[in-house]
């Protein structure tokens, strides 16, 4: 099994980024970069909401969290100078991005909810946390609890919530992807999510093999933001 080496910047000194804040500028940029990949089509609108009693609500402008989220949602990494012109670029692309107070409490200090809509009618809701020093975590995707921190490829397989099927599916997936970094499952009503963590992306053959398992509604891939 192969492993990535730690980065002296991201893991020891601090993130390579456009500032001013690792938690409130770099973190949001990484969150936006990760969340954007949950849409199969082009981003049309994003609503970023902050917990009413959280850290973002009174500082997101001063700490340029709004620039960070916007830049990441447009596909830029936190070290990109494009962060400075994020709003201008969003306007050029006809992408509407709103920032507002949410109706939820801060279960963690830097809790944010992102609701993303594509130009083809897709919609996805993500809860996220900027955990400090530029590190982040996606906590929930469309009602499924997850732990996505951006350090590997996250393969998200949406399927039926059936215990026997899930056990068999995970067994098959484990045989297909013997080099995985781990599996996690989450349920929401009648639906389930299988999350495979890998150090490499999927090939077209890999995707075809997953679909052959049956009862697969969707497959989404999040590429890492940490390197």
List the predicted regions and their residue ranges.
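Mixed-charge interfacial surface used for oligomerization/domain docking
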Residues: 108, 112-140
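A conserved regulatory-domain signal marking ACT and ACT-like small-molecule sensing domains
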Residues: 68, 99, 127-227
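Contiguous domain-boundary segments centered on the initiation and propagation of an alpha-helix
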Residues: 74-120
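Acidic-glycine-rich active-site phosphate/pyrophosphate-binding loop
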Residues: 1-9, 40-45
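A structural-propensity feature for long, helix-poor, extended segments
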Residues: 47-92
